[in-house]
Amino acid sequence: MQQRRPIRRALLSVSDKAGIVEFAQALSARGVELLSTGGTARLLAEKGLPVTEVSDYTGFPEMMDGRVKTLHPKVHGGILGRRGQDDAIMEEHQIQPIDMVVVNLYPFAKTVAREGCSLEDAVENIDIGGPTMVRSAAKNHKDVAIVVKSSDYDAIIKEMDDNEGSLTLATRFDLAIKAFEHTAAYDSMIANYFGSMVPAYHGESKEAAGRFPRTLNLNFIKKQDMRYGENSHQQAAFYIEENVKEASVATATQVQGKALSYNNIADTDAALECVKEFAEPACVIVKHANPCGVAISNSILDAYDRAYKTDPTSAFGGIIAFNRELDAETAQAIISRQFVEVIIAPSASEEALKITAAKQNVRVLTCGQWGERVPGLDFKRVNGGLLVQDRDLGMVGAEELRVVTQRQPTEQELRDALFCWKVAKFVKSNAIVYAKNNMTIGIGAGQMSRVYSAKIAGIKAADEGLEVKGSSMASDAFFPFRDGIDAAAAAGVTCVIQPGGSIRDDEVIAAADEHGIAMLFTDMRHFRH
């Protein structure tokens, strides 16, 4: 098998034309003959490049509104022909070898994402000739280079220059892998789209079956290998979606520190997603995927100081997330006060990075500013299966709350209730959060009984000398018994926010009235397992 193959003839047919003119110019300048189709050929000709239309090469016109362009033996024979083995038959049928295929596919994902996209629109954006050429070239990678990503254009030209116009087998093989990944992802999108429409298509319903197709095809790209997984005996890697539309741990840039661990990434995700809930300057400190301190204030420095005070013991070795730029003063406060694994923020000032650089092991990530939250899917692996659900983006405002007790909450109690309700959404169930003056003062997480989460929150507040009297308490789900209210009242809580919906709601409300507690129902639950 020849290790290097000279590139003498290339076929270019792309939907995404970013960089294609410059790439074609570079190929042409190196003596490569250009074949092309449709809009790509017109663009290259407009730029003064010598290009042969595929229809002129095959002697067969494009037809059926462009549905049939490249499905021809002179095209696929030129791609699939085995050099040194099929030369005679190629010569007999006047088939010229094609050494490089540059193809990206019709924008199916963008089409079906458009509001009002019809089935007909989707069908017309299913590429046939493109994937066929991609697979043909990838199959024959020992002789042909297949290019599906514009990000590879520069590297390909450089390698050709380093190898007298040739590409190595290693490069062709790597490009083939990318090509098969590309077509697999493309077919998966189409299968998912049509799979979700089966009932509607067969006339069983006028509505689509929903966002859950009968076969779920997922495509993620490996971002990095991990030293190990959740535990040292487990191997692990981090995979991300190709086109993430929201600032996240997956899109974040690490600007300082040693490599992220599996647990670092999981905890950073928990911290970042929580801090996104707040419009005011906010700080979230997470340990083992649970918030251990959260606060909002007029500055991230004060927010950090108050979040830290919730539970300094748990904050040791934690993950810290901000929703504003990390500044020098805040960075200095963190470094001077505690050991921290990861700091993530939309951005970080140069001065802040100089300060954190003094602690080389501290990982600093910037993720960019986020806008509206993007709907998507959450996954949970079970043995032999996968649970899939919509992301929990639900959140209630003050106008949606129902006061179910005799006493109305004060303005501050209401603010604190809404604040700790946002935090409770990110605490493992059973979740109880005590808050006062826009900071958490006690968090009870992950207990099997709700009353013990309430007791733990009170114990934590007492241990840190934080006053519970006049505070608000959030519960991620309803109280099955009044004991959780009794525990909160004993600690000093005066306002409770919870979903409601228990068969014993009357008893729970009565307990609140007995203690003079204001109680708010959200009619929305936030279990987190």
Curated annotation (Swiss-Prot):
Pfam families per UniProt: AICARFT_IMPCHas, MGS
Residues modified as N6-acetyllysine: K287
Ranges of residues in domain MGS-like: 1-148
Keywords, alphabetical: Acetylation, Hydrolase, Multifunctional enzyme, Purine biosynthesis, Transferase
Enzyme Commission number(s): 2.1.2.3, 3.5.4.10
Catalysis: reaction(s): (6R)-10-formyltetrahydrofolate + 5-amino-1-(5-phospho-beta-D-ribosyl)imidazole-4-carboxamide = 5-formamido-1-(5-phospho-D-ribosyl)imidazole-4-carboxamide + (6S)-5,6,7,8-tetrahydrofolate; IMP + H2O = 5-formamido-1-(5-phospho-D-ribosyl)imidazole-4-carboxamide
The keyword Acetylation is annotated on this UniProt entry: yes
Acetylation as UniProt keyword: yes
GO cellular component: cytosol
InterPro entries in alphabetical order: AICAR_Tfase_dup_dom_sf, Cytidine_deaminase-like, MGS-like_dom, MGS-like_dom_sf, PurH-like
Pathways involved: Purine metabolism; IMP biosynthesis via de novo pathway; 5-formamido-1-(5-phospho-D-ribosyl)imidazole-4-carboxamide from 5-amino-1-(5-phospho-D-ribosyl)imidazole-4-carboxamide (10-formyl THF route): step 1/1; Purine metabolism; IMP biosynthesis via de novo pathway; IMP from 5-formamido-1-(5-phospho-D-ribosyl)imidazole-4-carboxamide: step 1/1
MF annotations from Gene Ontology: IMP cyclohydrolase activity; phosphoribosylaminoimidazolecarboxamide formyltransferase activity
Homology family: Belongs to the PurH family.
The protein's name: Bifunctional purine biosynthesis protein PurH
Species annotation: Escherichia coli O139:H28 (strain E24377A / ETEC)
Originating gene: purH
